[in-house]
Amino acid sequence: MRFKQDFFEQLVGYYSQVFPQGISNPHWLAWSEDAAGLIGLTQPTDELLQGMSGNAQIDGASYYAQVYSGHQFGGYSPQLGDGRSIILGEALGPQGTWDVALKGAGPTPYSRHGDGRAVMRSAVREFLISEALHHLHIPTTRALAVIGSDVPVWRETQETAAITVRLAKSHIRFGHFEFFCHSERGAPTKLKQLLDFTISQHYPDLSCDAAGYKAWFARVVTDTAKMIANWQAIGFAHGVMNTDNMSILGDTFDFGPFAFLDTFKEDFICNHSDPEGRYAFGQQPGIGLWNLQRLAQALSSIIASDDLIAALNMYQGELVKHYLILMRGKLGLTTSVTEAELDDQDLALIGGFTSLMERNQLDYTNTWRRFGQLDPSSSHSSLRDDFVDRDGFDAWYQLYQARLGNVEEVEQWQAARNRANPKYILRNYLAQEAIIGVEEGNLAPLQQLQQVLQNPFDEQLEFDDLAKRPPDWGQGLIMSCSS
């Protein structure tokens, strides 16, 4: 790997230098060849294993943990920071740079009495979800590898430590700006320096002046809205949408007790630590705006309030616009830019269908996938038999056919639905089965699941079992933040 060190060299005071604590008996548990290509790597090697496990230094790496703060479940925490993640620097790849971070590499000054380790199960989950979201075309950080060890760590019970090698276009979060707004570490000078660095590194078409700041914040709002629209369309619940878990680039970031919907539930809670449902599936769009408001508050000494408000007022429209693009693709609806009056009609049609799904306790992903088998020219839908409330479905289907209109090339239409509606998602029970395999020394379930998730829209008939509804024990699994 070749590195540059722009964050480390230009933002002194925004991090603490800290070196990994090596792990005993390091061994590869998972490797993403696709992610490796982003930073010019091909195959895992013994040299890489020693470096990424913290047992040897990597040439050109700087090793640091960033400091930030954030709103956690609505309350402000004045100092957080990378408590178990150590960044090596920005690796140079064929098409740009990627931060390389070792998550679980040992304690840092921001560990808050933690051991700085990650347990194997959380490392495997982060690896799988990072790669799954990428192949579902959802903006996300990436996972290069998981490195196992025989280091014991204690959570509720004794577990084994592992390291996830994470790649991110940037690790800058909403919480970075909050920290340098509210702390006494040279603010507001450091706040402006961070903003200028972010723009120059990641928005090179914008200037570091009032006009550039205005355009930048509007872009952050738009990118965040698009990210969350993607989540809602695919049925993904993040679980911990604290502001320190929000990427400034609109990438899905910091995976904990996430889940994809099994049976559709608007109020689905995937996080055992969120009994009130602050971060429930249906609350995510509103929380996205709330988090952006906290970011705007942190930037209010630099960016004019009118510009911040104008950008925030764009959020709902951007969210709905992108959500409609995705959902029309799932349903096979077409529209032109001159038919904006169809937006309300289509939102009602989409909402009517998801409500039917919820009342009939249907699987979200599998129900959408059935549109690839639908004959849209037929008055009788093969979907009808999936519903207990068939009268309700008939009423909805009549509205749907009227909106759809005439479809001349049915096979092409069906193929397009299969390109919009995945067959395979990372269901929590599948991740759990892969983790059990790793615990038993069998990497085959993990490797097979990784392979399938790389092509989620393909039939892959030999893996049909991985697309079925979960067994009773695996339905709607709720995870904890323990990692």
UniProtKB/Swiss-Prot annotation:
One of its GO terms (molecular function) is ATP binding. Signal peptide: none annotated. The keyword Chaperone does not apply. It catalyses: L-seryl-[protein] + ATP = 3-O-(5'-adenylyl)-L-seryl-[protein] + diphosphate; L-threonyl-[protein] + ATP = 3-O-(5'-adenylyl)-L-threonyl-[protein] + diphosphate; L-tyrosyl-[protein] + ATP = O-(5'-adenylyl)-L-tyrosyl-[protein] + diphosphate; L-histidyl-[protein] + UTP = N(tele)-(5'-uridylyl)-L-histidyl-[protein] + diphosphate. Mg(2+) binds at N245, D254. Pfam families: SelO. Belongs to the SELO family. Nucleotidyltransferase involved in the post-translational modification of proteins. It can catalyze the addition of adenosine monophosphate (AMP) or uridine monophosphate (UMP) to a protein, resulting in modifications known as AMPylation and UMPylation. This is Protein nucleotidyltransferase YdiU. It comes from Shewanella halifaxensis (strain HAW-EB4). The gene is ydiU.
